[in-house]
Amino acid sequence: MAQAPDREKALELAMAQIEKSYGKGSVMRLGDEVRQPISIIPTGSIALDVALGIGGLPRGRVIEIYGPESSGKTTVALHAVANAQAAGGVAAFIDAEHALDPEYAKKLGVDTDSLLVSQPDTGEQALEIADMLIRSGALDIVVIDSVAALVPRAELEGEMGDSHVGLQARLMSQALRKMTGALNNSGTTAIFINQLRDKIGVMFGSPETTTGGKALKFYASVRMDVRRIETLKDGTNAVGNRTRVKIVKNKVSPPFKQAEFDILYGRGISREGSLIDMGVDQGFIRKSGAWFTYEGEQLGQGKENARNFLLENGEVANEIEKKIKEKLGIGAVVTDDGVLPAPVDF
Protein backbone atom coordinates (compact mmCIF):
# COMPACT_ATOMS: atom_id res chain seq x y z
CA MET A 1 0.00 0.00 0.00
CA ALA A 2 1.27 3.50 -0.89
CA GLN A 3 2.25 5.89 1.89
CA ALA A 4 -0.37 8.42 3.03
CA PRO A 5 1.34 11.48 1.39
CA ASP A 6 1.63 9.55 -1.90
CA ARG A 7 -2.02 8.54 -1.75
CA GLU A 8 -3.07 12.12 -1.08
CA LYS A 9 -0.93 13.36 -3.99
CA ALA A 10 -2.38 10.69 -6.30
CA LEU A 11 -5.90 11.70 -5.27
CA GLU A 12 -5.19 15.39 -5.92
CA LEU A 13 -3.80 14.54 -9.39
CA ALA A 14 -6.88 12.43 -10.16
CA MET A 15 -9.21 15.22 -9.01
CA ALA A 16 -7.29 17.78 -11.09
CA GLN A 17 -7.58 15.52 -14.16
CA ILE A 18 -11.33 15.03 -13.56
CA GLU A 19 -11.88 18.79 -13.25
CA LYS A 20 -9.85 19.38 -16.42
CA SER A 21 -11.96 16.83 -18.31
CA TYR A 22 -15.42 17.54 -16.87
CA GLY A 23 -15.23 21.07 -15.46
CA LYS A 24 -14.73 22.70 -12.07
CA GLY A 25 -16.93 21.30 -9.32
CA SER A 26 -17.46 17.92 -11.00
CA VAL A 27 -15.87 16.31 -7.93
CA MET A 28 -15.23 17.90 -4.54
CA ARG A 29 -15.03 17.18 -0.84
CA LEU A 30 -18.35 17.84 0.84
CA GLY A 31 -16.66 20.07 3.42
CA ASP A 32 -14.84 22.23 0.85
CA GLU A 33 -17.82 24.52 0.27
CA VAL A 34 -20.53 25.77 2.57
CA ARG A 35 -23.67 23.67 2.05
CA GLN A 36 -26.35 25.73 0.43
CA PRO A 37 -29.71 25.74 2.20
CA ILE A 38 -32.57 24.03 0.37
CA SER A 39 -34.53 26.61 -1.61
CA ILE A 40 -38.27 26.11 -1.62
CA ILE A 41 -41.52 27.02 -3.37
CA PRO A 42 -44.42 27.56 -0.92
CA THR A 43 -47.51 25.41 -1.52
CA GLY A 44 -50.16 27.97 -0.57
CA SER A 45 -51.13 26.09 2.61
CA ILE A 46 -49.06 26.77 5.73
CA ALA A 47 -50.18 23.40 7.15
CA LEU A 48 -48.72 21.61 4.10
CA ASP A 49 -45.55 23.74 4.25
CA VAL A 50 -45.07 22.62 7.87
CA ALA A 51 -45.76 18.95 7.02
CA LEU A 52 -43.10 19.10 4.29
CA GLY A 53 -40.62 20.14 6.99
CA ILE A 54 -38.74 22.81 5.02
CA GLY A 55 -41.52 25.29 4.34
CA GLY A 56 -42.56 24.20 0.85
CA LEU A 57 -41.58 22.08 -2.14
CA PRO A 58 -37.79 21.70 -2.63
CA ARG A 59 -36.31 23.25 -5.76
CA GLY A 60 -34.34 21.10 -8.18
CA ARG A 61 -36.22 17.93 -7.24
CA VAL A 62 -38.89 15.58 -8.58
CA ILE A 63 -42.26 15.77 -6.79
CA GLU A 64 -45.14 13.31 -7.23
CA ILE A 65 -48.71 14.29 -6.31
CA TYR A 66 -51.24 11.47 -6.53
CA GLY A 67 -54.72 10.64 -5.31
CA PRO A 68 -58.30 9.85 -6.39
CA GLU A 69 -60.18 11.96 -8.93
CA SER A 70 -61.24 15.48 -7.86
CA SER A 71 -59.14 15.33 -4.68
CA GLY A 72 -57.22 18.58 -5.34
CA LYS A 73 -54.01 17.36 -7.04
CA THR A 74 -53.99 19.93 -9.84
CA THR A 75 -55.08 22.69 -7.43
CA VAL A 76 -52.05 22.02 -5.19
CA ALA A 77 -49.76 22.05 -8.26
CA LEU A 78 -51.26 25.30 -9.61
CA HIS A 79 -50.79 27.02 -6.24
CA ALA A 80 -47.09 26.05 -6.36
CA VAL A 81 -46.95 27.52 -9.90
CA ALA A 82 -48.58 30.76 -8.68
CA ASN A 83 -46.11 31.08 -5.78
CA ALA A 84 -43.12 30.41 -8.05
CA GLN A 85 -44.36 33.15 -10.41
CA ALA A 86 -45.00 35.54 -7.49
CA ALA A 87 -41.32 35.20 -6.55
CA GLY A 88 -40.35 36.19 -10.11
CA GLY A 89 -39.98 32.67 -11.53
CA VAL A 90 -40.93 31.12 -14.86
CA ALA A 91 -43.41 28.23 -14.93
CA ALA A 92 -44.48 25.63 -17.49
CA PHE A 93 -47.52 23.34 -17.57
CA ILE A 94 -47.44 20.20 -19.72
CA ASP A 95 -51.16 19.49 -20.13
CA ALA A 96 -51.17 15.87 -21.30
CA GLU A 97 -54.79 15.46 -20.14
CA HIS A 98 -55.87 18.50 -22.23
CA ALA A 99 -57.95 19.61 -19.25
CA LEU A 100 -56.30 22.81 -17.96
CA ASP A 101 -58.85 25.53 -17.15
CA PRO A 102 -57.10 28.91 -17.62
CA GLU A 103 -59.89 30.81 -15.81
CA TYR A 104 -59.61 28.59 -12.73
CA ALA A 105 -55.80 28.87 -12.82
CA LYS A 106 -56.12 32.68 -12.93
CA LYS A 107 -58.39 32.63 -9.84
CA LEU A 108 -55.68 30.72 -7.95
CA GLY A 109 -53.17 33.47 -8.69
CA VAL A 110 -51.45 31.97 -11.75
CA ASP A 111 -50.20 34.52 -14.27
CA THR A 112 -51.72 32.77 -17.28
CA ASP A 113 -50.27 35.32 -19.73
CA SER A 114 -46.68 34.29 -18.91
CA LEU A 115 -47.39 30.60 -18.16
CA LEU A 116 -45.79 28.28 -20.74
CA VAL A 117 -48.37 25.66 -21.78
CA SER A 118 -47.98 22.60 -23.98
CA GLN A 119 -50.67 20.10 -24.99
CA PRO A 120 -48.57 17.32 -26.53
CA ASP A 121 -49.83 14.51 -28.75
CA THR A 122 -47.69 11.71 -27.29
CA GLY A 123 -45.90 10.83 -24.06
CA GLU A 124 -42.52 11.04 -25.80
CA GLN A 125 -43.30 14.55 -27.05
CA ALA A 126 -44.47 15.68 -23.59
CA LEU A 127 -41.35 14.47 -21.80
CA GLU A 128 -39.00 15.74 -24.54
CA ILE A 129 -40.57 19.22 -24.29
CA ALA A 130 -40.24 19.13 -20.49
CA ASP A 131 -36.60 18.01 -20.75
CA MET A 132 -35.70 20.78 -23.23
CA LEU A 133 -37.33 23.45 -21.05
CA ILE A 134 -35.51 22.16 -17.95
CA ARG A 135 -32.13 22.10 -19.75
CA SER A 136 -32.61 25.74 -20.80
CA GLY A 137 -31.88 26.65 -17.17
CA ALA A 138 -34.53 29.40 -17.29
CA LEU A 139 -37.39 27.45 -15.71
CA ASP A 140 -38.35 27.42 -12.01
CA ILE A 141 -41.18 24.89 -12.05
CA VAL A 142 -42.75 22.49 -14.54
CA VAL A 143 -45.96 20.52 -13.97
CA ILE A 144 -46.75 17.34 -15.93
CA ASP A 145 -50.50 16.61 -15.72
CA SER A 146 -50.70 13.66 -15.67
CA VAL A 147 -48.45 10.60 -15.87
CA ALA A 148 -51.44 8.40 -16.78
CA ALA A 149 -52.10 10.57 -19.86
CA LEU A 150 -48.53 10.16 -21.22
CA VAL A 151 -49.48 7.74 -23.99
CA PRO A 152 -46.50 6.12 -25.79
CA ARG A 153 -46.41 6.74 -29.55
CA ALA A 154 -46.57 3.00 -30.32
CA GLU A 155 -49.84 2.72 -28.39
CA LEU A 156 -51.38 5.67 -30.23
CA GLU A 157 -50.40 4.26 -33.61
CA GLY A 158 -51.60 0.74 -32.77
CA GLU A 159 -55.09 -0.74 -32.76
CA MET A 160 -57.46 -0.30 -29.82
CA GLY A 161 -57.13 -3.88 -28.53
CA ASP A 162 -53.34 -4.20 -28.92
CA SER A 163 -51.25 -5.08 -25.87
CA HIS A 164 -48.36 -2.76 -25.04
CA VAL A 165 -46.86 -4.17 -21.86
CA GLY A 166 -44.46 -1.91 -19.97
CA LEU A 167 -44.16 0.79 -22.64
CA GLN A 168 -45.20 3.65 -20.37
CA ALA A 169 -43.00 2.40 -17.51
CA ARG A 170 -39.94 2.27 -19.82
CA LEU A 171 -40.76 5.74 -21.14
CA MET A 172 -40.95 7.19 -17.60
CA SER A 173 -37.78 5.39 -16.52
CA GLN A 174 -35.76 6.78 -19.44
CA ALA A 175 -37.16 10.31 -19.05
CA LEU A 176 -36.42 10.48 -15.32
CA ARG A 177 -32.86 9.19 -15.86
CA LYS A 178 -32.30 12.08 -18.26
CA MET A 179 -34.11 14.75 -16.25
CA THR A 180 -32.84 14.26 -12.70
CA GLY A 181 -29.35 15.74 -13.20
CA ALA A 182 -30.68 18.64 -15.28
CA LEU A 183 -33.29 19.44 -12.60
CA ASN A 184 -30.60 19.63 -9.93
CA ASN A 185 -28.28 21.78 -12.05
CA SER A 186 -31.01 24.23 -13.10
CA GLY A 187 -32.89 24.33 -9.76
CA THR A 188 -36.14 23.46 -11.53
CA THR A 189 -38.89 21.68 -9.60
CA ALA A 190 -40.74 19.03 -11.63
CA ILE A 191 -44.20 18.10 -10.36
CA PHE A 192 -45.68 14.91 -11.76
CA ILE A 193 -49.42 14.53 -11.11
CA ASN A 194 -50.47 10.89 -11.05
CA GLN A 195 -53.65 8.82 -10.90
CA LEU A 196 -54.53 5.75 -8.85
CA ARG A 197 -55.27 2.25 -10.13
CA ASP A 198 -56.29 -0.92 -8.28
CA LYS A 199 -54.06 -4.00 -8.34
CA ILE A 200 -56.01 -7.18 -9.06
CA GLY A 201 -56.05 -10.00 -6.48
CA VAL A 202 -54.47 -8.14 -3.53
CA MET A 203 -55.60 -9.86 -0.32
CA PHE A 204 -53.52 -7.91 2.23
CA GLY A 205 -52.50 -4.27 2.32
CA SER A 206 -53.71 -1.51 0.03
CA PRO A 207 -54.68 -2.56 -3.52
CA GLU A 208 -54.01 0.99 -4.77
CA THR A 209 -51.02 1.77 -6.96
CA THR A 210 -49.94 4.65 -9.20
CA THR A 211 -49.48 4.50 -12.98
CA GLY A 212 -46.23 4.69 -14.94
CA GLY A 213 -44.20 1.95 -13.25
CA LYS A 214 -41.82 2.20 -10.30
CA ALA A 215 -39.25 4.70 -11.61
CA LEU A 216 -41.14 7.77 -10.40
CA LYS A 217 -41.42 6.30 -6.89
CA PHE A 218 -37.61 6.02 -6.76
CA TYR A 219 -36.70 9.35 -8.37
CA ALA A 220 -39.23 11.48 -6.46
CA SER A 221 -37.82 13.40 -3.48
CA VAL A 222 -41.35 14.06 -2.22
CA ARG A 223 -44.50 11.98 -2.76
CA MET A 224 -47.84 13.40 -1.62
CA ASP A 225 -51.07 11.43 -1.26
CA VAL A 226 -54.01 13.86 -1.64
CA ARG A 227 -57.48 12.85 -0.37
CA ARG A 228 -60.81 14.64 -0.04
CA ILE A 229 -62.14 13.87 3.44
CA GLU A 230 -65.16 16.15 3.86
CA THR A 231 -67.48 18.45 1.91
CA LEU A 232 -67.63 22.02 3.23
CA LYS A 233 -71.13 23.50 3.26
CA ASP A 234 -72.65 26.95 3.65
CA GLY A 235 -76.14 25.99 4.75
CA THR A 236 -77.15 23.36 2.20
CA ASN A 237 -74.76 24.54 -0.53
CA ALA A 238 -71.41 22.79 -1.00
CA VAL A 239 -68.70 25.48 -1.09
CA GLY A 240 -65.53 23.37 -0.99
CA ASN A 241 -63.69 20.32 0.29
CA ARG A 242 -61.64 19.53 3.37
CA THR A 243 -58.46 17.93 2.03
CA ARG A 244 -55.87 15.76 3.75
CA VAL A 245 -52.36 15.38 2.33
CA LYS A 246 -50.03 12.67 3.59
CA ILE A 247 -46.30 12.98 2.84
CA VAL A 248 -45.60 9.32 2.03
CA LYS A 249 -41.99 9.96 0.97
CA ASN A 250 -39.67 12.84 1.86
CA LYS A 251 -35.92 12.93 1.16
CA VAL A 252 -35.42 16.41 2.62
CA SER A 253 -37.24 16.04 5.95
CA PRO A 254 -38.88 13.30 8.07
CA PRO A 255 -41.77 11.70 6.12
CA PHE A 256 -45.29 10.47 7.05
CA LYS A 257 -46.54 13.82 8.30
CA GLN A 258 -50.08 14.93 7.45
CA ALA A 259 -51.70 18.26 6.68
CA GLU A 260 -55.35 19.25 6.43
CA PHE A 261 -56.67 22.36 4.70
CA ASP A 262 -59.73 23.70 2.88
CA ILE A 263 -60.06 23.93 -0.90
CA LEU A 264 -62.87 26.34 -1.81
CA TYR A 265 -64.61 26.01 -5.17
CA GLY A 266 -63.45 28.73 -7.55
CA ARG A 267 -60.81 30.02 -5.08
CA GLY A 268 -58.49 27.09 -4.43
CA ILE A 269 -56.60 26.50 -1.17
CA SER A 270 -57.90 28.78 1.58
CA ARG A 271 -54.75 30.44 2.93
CA GLU A 272 -56.80 32.18 5.62
CA GLY A 273 -58.47 28.93 6.74
CA SER A 274 -55.06 27.28 7.01
CA LEU A 275 -53.75 30.22 9.07
CA ILE A 276 -56.71 29.92 11.46
CA ASP A 277 -56.13 26.17 11.93
CA MET A 278 -52.38 26.58 12.51
CA GLY A 279 -52.86 29.74 14.59
CA VAL A 280 -55.14 27.86 16.99
CA ASP A 281 -52.73 24.87 17.11
CA GLN A 282 -49.74 27.11 17.88
CA GLY A 283 -51.60 29.27 20.43
CA PHE A 284 -51.57 32.55 18.48
CA ILE A 285 -55.34 32.50 17.89
CA ARG A 286 -57.68 31.80 20.80
CA LYS A 287 -60.84 29.79 20.16
CA SER A 288 -63.59 30.24 22.72
CA GLY A 289 -66.79 28.45 21.74
CA ALA A 290 -67.42 29.57 18.16
CA TRP A 291 -65.44 32.83 18.53
CA PHE A 292 -61.88 33.30 17.24
CA THR A 293 -59.72 35.99 18.89
CA TYR A 294 -56.24 37.28 17.99
CA GLU A 295 -54.40 39.53 20.49
CA GLY A 296 -57.67 40.72 22.03
CA GLU A 297 -59.25 41.46 18.64
CA GLN A 298 -62.24 39.31 17.66
CA LEU A 299 -61.81 37.78 14.21
CA GLY A 300 -65.39 36.55 14.04
CA GLN A 301 -67.94 34.01 15.17
CA GLY A 302 -67.44 30.77 13.28
CA LYS A 303 -64.57 29.86 10.99
CA GLU A 304 -66.19 31.36 7.88
CA ASN A 305 -66.51 34.82 9.48
CA ALA A 306 -62.95 34.63 10.83
CA ARG A 307 -61.75 33.62 7.35
CA ASN A 308 -63.53 36.63 5.80
CA PHE A 309 -61.97 38.95 8.41
CA LEU A 310 -58.45 37.77 7.50
CA LEU A 311 -59.31 38.05 3.80
CA GLU A 312 -60.28 41.70 4.28
CA ASN A 313 -57.39 42.46 6.68
CA GLY A 314 -54.33 41.10 4.89
CA GLU A 315 -51.84 42.70 7.28
CA VAL A 316 -53.30 40.69 10.19
CA ALA A 317 -53.07 37.47 8.13
CA ASN A 318 -49.44 38.24 7.20
CA GLU A 319 -48.61 38.93 10.86
CA ILE A 320 -50.11 35.60 11.99
CA GLU A 321 -48.27 33.73 9.20
CA LYS A 322 -44.97 35.39 10.12
CA LYS A 323 -45.35 34.41 13.78
CA ILE A 324 -46.22 30.80 12.94
CA LYS A 325 -43.26 30.43 10.57
CA GLU A 326 -40.84 32.07 13.00
CA LYS A 327 -41.98 29.77 15.80
CA LEU A 328 -41.67 26.64 13.65
CA GLY A 329 -38.54 27.86 11.81
CA ILE A 330 -39.79 27.21 8.29
CA GLY A 331 -40.10 28.62 4.83
CA ALA A 332 -41.10 31.67 2.91
CA VAL A 333 -43.03 34.63 4.26
CA VAL A 334 -45.89 36.28 2.34
CA THR A 335 -45.89 40.06 2.66
CA ASP A 336 -47.80 42.90 0.99
CA ASP A 337 -45.04 42.88 -1.65
CA GLY A 338 -45.62 39.21 -2.49
CA VAL A 339 -43.87 35.99 -1.55
CA LEU A 340 -40.40 36.41 -0.07
CA PRO A 341 -38.54 33.09 -0.24
CA ALA A 342 -36.56 32.28 2.90
CA PRO A 343 -34.31 29.26 2.22
CA VAL A 344 -34.17 26.78 5.06
CA ASP A 345 -31.12 24.94 6.37
CA PHE A 346 -31.60 21.21 6.81
Curated annotation (Swiss-Prot):
CDD domains to which the protein is assigned, alphabetical: RecA
SUPFAM superfamilies: P-loop containing nucleoside triphosphate hydrolases, RecA protein, C-terminal domain
Lineage top rank: taxon: Bacteria
Coiled-coil stretches noted in the UniProt entry, renumbered to this chain: none
Localisation: Cytoplasm
Major location category of this protein: cytoplasm
Gene Ontology cellular component list: cytosol
GO molecular function terms listed in the Swiss-Prot or TrEMBL record: ATP binding; ATP hydrolysis activity; ATP-dependent DNA damage sensor activity; damaged DNA binding; single-stranded DNA binding
Keyword annotations: ATP-binding, Cytoplasm, DNA damage, DNA recombination, DNA repair, DNA-binding, Nucleotide-binding, SOS response
GO biological process, one term: SOS response
InterPro entries: AAA+_ATPase, DNA_recomb/repair_RecA, DNA_recomb/repair_RecA_CS, P-loop_NTPase, RecA-like_C, RecA-like_N, RecA_ATP-bd, RecA_C_sf
Amino-acid positions noted as binding ATP in the UniProt annotation, renumbered to this chain: 67-74
HAMAP family named in the record: RecA
Family, similarity comment: Belongs to the RecA family.
Function: Can catalyze the hydrolysis of ATP in the presence of single-stranded DNA, the ATP-dependent uptake of single-stranded DNA by duplex DNA, and the ATP-dependent hybridization of homologous single-stranded DNAs. It interacts with LexA causing its activation and leading to its autocatalytic cleavage.
The protein's name: Protein RecA
Species assigned in the record: Mycobacterium marinum (strain ATCC BAA-535 / M)
Lineage: Bacteria, Bacillati, Actinomycetota, Actinomycetes, Mycobacteriales
